[in-house]
Every structure is written in structure tokens, then in C-alpha cells.
């Protein structure tokens, strides 16, 4: 037994609900889930409407939120650690408004934290907003399919080419509507639910600037929060280093 195994066993069993982001499905969490289960935790990975095997892309943010709320309540989950990655951050913000009494802690992993009245696309510089919206306009069903070279350089910048291609091949076009909707988050900002922010330093999906970026720009909106930092990019680290990510999640989630 190495020191990391001892470290894991010092932490009580937790119930994790892992909410994936755009262009992926629950398989994004596969390696991390395996590591968390090995540590003795309980893990749930709901699939968001309009993602993965769900071919109906005509969804909005409310539909997605309702599905996660239904998943948690129908499975009678309580005292959960609710984790959102990327777009999943906006989902857990809205879920927390309805289920704050079931949530022990919110964890945002390089996740969007929106101000009241903002959309996800509002978090990007104007040039990037136009790029994404033009892709949606060019599609037949208001979805966004990222070009491979953009995905390779921005989303999986630390991966080798073979890994980048494997991850890209598993992506599906992203419904655009939930990304452009401006969300009412007044209730979220009245909550006192403990929260954490995990920041991977090489994640470049949202350019870091005076008025943009994961950390400190979006993370600071959480008020008082636990900050956990690691090394990794937006999508390949979950696949290549799942044990590392599981440990960061445990650090972010512990009492």
C-alpha cells in the first residue's frame, strides 16, 4: 500500500454526482469513476439531454437542469458532492437552486460560473463567440461541431495526436441553445452551500485575461471557496491521468 492509498482511506465514503460538459457524455468520467470506486466512494454520472446517445438536439438549459434534478431525486440521493466540468458548471448552479438541501458541496472543475443574467457564450471574447455562433448557424440543427484542429490545439493541448483523435472521435455536436441562453441565477447567489474550484493550469479553453478565464475571473464569483490547482488540459487529462484527477476531486470534496 503506497502513501496515496493511505491518503484515500483516510476519507469517509462520499456520494459523487458527476455532471459532464459539452460535446461529451458520461463516458468522459469513465476512468475517474473507476478510481473513485476503488477508493470506496459512490459515483453517479447522469447523461445530459441532447448528448451522447440522445439524438434529439432540440433542448434548452431548463430541460437539461430538470433531467439532473430528476436523476438525483428519483435515485433518492442526499448529502452529495455535485461536480460540474466545463458547461456542467452552469448546470450545477441551476440544480443547486432547487436541491441545495441535498448537496454537501459543489465542485466546479474548470467549469463555467455565470453571473446572474449571463450566458455561457458571454464568457468568451467576441471573436470566440462569433466563431462558435457561426458554427451553429452553418449546421442544419443549431448544433456546434468543433473542427478537429481547433479541438486539438485548445481542448486537448497536452495530448499526443493519437489520443487527441481518440477523444475527438467520441465527441458529438453540441446543442447551441443552452450555451446562448441567459440564466436567472439570483437564487444561486443567495445560497451558502460550500463550494470548491479545481483549476488545471494548462486548460486554455477560455482565454485568461482581465475579464475572462477560469481562475481567478470565474472562480472568484463563488465568493468563499476552496481552491485546488493541478496540471492538465480541458479534456485529455481525465482520460490519460484519471487517478490524478480523482485525487484532486477528493481534495476538493473532503470535509
What kind of feature is each model-predicted range?
Residues 169-188:
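Active-site nucleophile elbow and catalytic-triad environment of alpha/beta-hydrolase enzymes
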Residues 17-21, 85, 199-200:
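The conserved beta1-alpha1 loop
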Residues 42, 48-81, 97-98, 121-124:
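Active-site loop/oxyanion-hole signature of alpha/beta-hydrolase fold enzymes
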Residues 201-233, 241, 248, 252:
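Conserved loop-alpha-helix segment in the C-terminal half of the alpha/beta-hydrolase fold
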Residues 191, 197-199:
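Short beta-strand/loop motif that positions the catalytic acidic residue
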Residues 11-53:
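Conserved HGGG/HGGXW glycine-rich cap/lid loop of the alpha/beta-hydrolase fold
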Residues 83-88, 92:
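Gly/Ala-rich beta-loop-alpha elbow adjacent to hydrolase catalytic centers
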Amino acid at each position: 500500500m503506497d502513501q496515496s492509498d493511505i491518503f484515500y482511506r483516510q476519507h469517509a465514503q462520499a456520494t459523487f454526482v458527476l455532471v459532464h460538459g459539452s460535446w461529451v457524455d458520461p463516458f468522459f468520467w469513465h476512468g475517474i469513476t473507476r478510481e473513485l470506486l476503488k477508493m470506496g466512494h459512490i459515483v453517479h454520472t447522469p447523461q445530459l439531454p441532447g448528448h451522447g446517445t440522445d439524438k434529439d438536439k432540440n433542448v434548452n438549459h431548463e430541460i437539461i437542469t430538470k433531467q439532473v434534478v430528476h436523476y438525483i431525486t428519483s435515485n433518492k440521493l442526499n448529502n452529495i458532492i455535485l461536480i460540474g466540468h466545463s458547461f456542467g458548471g452552469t448546470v450545477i448552479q441551476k440544480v443547486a437552486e432547487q436541491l441545495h438541501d441535498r448537496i454537501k458541496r459543489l465542485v466546479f472543475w474548470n467549469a463555467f460560473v455565470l453571473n446572474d443574467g449571463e450566458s455561457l457564450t458571454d464568457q468568451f471574447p467576441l471573436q470566440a463567440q462569433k466563431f462558435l455562433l457561426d458554427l451553429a448557424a452553418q449546421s442544419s440543427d443549431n448544433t456546434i461541431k468543433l473542427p478537429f484542429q481547433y479541438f486539438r490545439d485548445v481542448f486537448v493541448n497536452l495530448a499526443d495526436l493519437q489520443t487527441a483523435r481518440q477523444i475527438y472521435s467520441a465527441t458529438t455536436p453540441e446543442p447551441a441553445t443552452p450555451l446562448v441562453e441567459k440564466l436567472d441565477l439570483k437564487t444561486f447567489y443567495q445560497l451558502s452551500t460550500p463550494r470548491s474550484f479545481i483549476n488545471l493550469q494548462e486548460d486554455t479553453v477560455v482565454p485568461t485575461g482581465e475579464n475572462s478565464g477560469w481562475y481567478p475571473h470565474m472562480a472568484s464569483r463563488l465568493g468563499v471557496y476552496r481552491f485546488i490547482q493541478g496540471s492538465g488540459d480541458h479534456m485529455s487529462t481525465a482520460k490519460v491521468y484519471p487517478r490524478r484527477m480523482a485525487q484532486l476531486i477528493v481534495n476538493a470534496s473532503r470535509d
